[in-house]
Amino acid sequence: MSLHLSNVILHQLSKNDQDELMVNYRSESLVNDSSTENLVAELHRVFHSKAGKGFGCFQSDSEFQIWLNELQRGELNFYDFSQKCAVRLKEELAKYPFADEGILVFAEYQSLATDYLFVGILPLNQSLKVTEGLDISATDYLDINKMDIAARIDLSVYEADKESNRYLSYIKGRVGRKVADFFLDFLQAEVGLDSKQQNQVLMQALDDFCTDAKLEKQEVNEYKKQVYEYCNGQIKAGEEVEIRELSGELPPSPSGASFLEFTQEQGYGLEESFPADRGLVRKLTKYVGAGGGLNVSFDSLLLGERIFYDPETDTLTIKGTPPNLRDQLTRNR
């Protein structure tokens, strides 16, 4: 991975005897070497792979934004920037029930010609190691894959377009922890691009496009398969869905209108690009549902062929079961 590291520093969040959250500040930034580059590269990879990220932008009175601008102009050095932010983060984090201990990371770096600022809390975990004398001892390690309190600012987009609603991204975290609320409060930011909503609108626009074109079932399935393959390819490549590019992959309607023209004429309000939602994209070629101890998933092509649904009785009929399922059912009659 091509990554150029500019600055990185660690501070530690811990609780004192009164269970109050404290910050143990490192005295200076870390040296830029292979270890720190590998750390930031792993942070970038894990953050990028996290599903369901939120996007936003700074509020007009954001202190974090003021400090960031001062950092960008060279009026504030990286160490002082990290200290100011650490104080504010500690004050905000103390308001929430998940005020975890951990390692606070600030990193400024470039990857694939894009500049980023990363802020995150890395959980510390314990494991065992074997010493040179072949004894067993405990050791702490950074559990980066379990990171769920982190945000990243695309500095390249931020510098080019401060009116953008998506230069800031953050991990939404586990349900019930309100991690997203915390990070928005800390950064004094507001929700911007809703990528899941954009994906839902895309799916609706595709359904409407097929209906408007009066396509046969087989043609509809082929359209959805093409959209799935494009979106899935973008997910694997770490790229976003580009509506113009997607439209170029699809054949026009019988009237000659492209998918892009259709979405623009009908006013769907789709952004030019946005991250694909893996769960929603999957439903283009599959019917998926779970609940009440039942988990059902099958290719959409099978509906009406081997699988039939009766909405009046809410009954799903399957003709021809998979061999391994049939074997289990036969043995346990």
From Swiss-Prot:
One Gene Ontology cellular component: bacterial nucleoid
Transmembrane segments: none
Keyword Hydrolase found: no
Main location: cytoplasm
Gene Ontology molecular function terms on file: double-stranded DNA binding; single-stranded RNA binding
Domain of life, source organism: Bacteria
Pfam families with a match to the protein in the record: NA37
Subcellular location: Cytoplasm, Nucleoid
InterPro entries on file: Nucleoid_associated_NdpA (IPR007358)
Keyword tags: Cytoplasm
Similarity section: Belongs to the YejK family.
Listed name of the protein: Nucleoid-associated protein VV1167
